[in-house]
Amino acid sequence: MCDRNSQRKIYMLIAIMKKKILFLCTGNSCRSQMAEGWTKFLKKDEIDAYSAGIETHGLNPYAVKVMAEKGVDMSNHESTNVKDLLHIDFDYVITVCGHANENCPIFPGQAKIIHVGFDDPPKMAEKFENEGKKLDCYRKVRDEIKMFIENELDSLL
């Protein structure tokens, strides 16, 4: 049995060992938010996940809805500008869209920049008027991001 001081040291060591990852996209409204949500849901003990955008476009309600369908609550997420997170010493910055990859700022420290592109759900959905078909576009990308977090993320780190 560990005493309180030993437990505190163990928790501090675990916190130090956790990787800090930023998921970056254009507006921090959809893809990067989904990636942050899935990472916190699936790998909270291994990774401190953040998301941001080159700009802030507000949280996409369709993204919130389809993530909630899988038990991931993003209702309290906010759209964050990457400039507000430059003080954090990230281990990895993962760009999830081409615009963010091309305009990724320079991060202090040793952050490794990785690009893993996903389709843009709002752009895919704009050709549909039917709500169900729009949501299907978001579900497709939601599921692709989940597969990436579950099956490929660890191999990149």
Role assignments for model-derived ranges:
Residues 53, 97, 117-119:
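Residues at the C-termini of beta-strands that transition into short coil/loop
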Residues 13-84:
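Conserved active-site segments centered on acidic
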Residues 1-16:
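N-terminal amphipathic/basic-hydrophobic helices that include classical n-h-c signal peptides
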Residues 91:
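Conserved acidic residues
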Residues 27-29, 98-101:
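Short glycine-rich anion-binding loops that position phosphate/pyrophosphate groups of nucleotides
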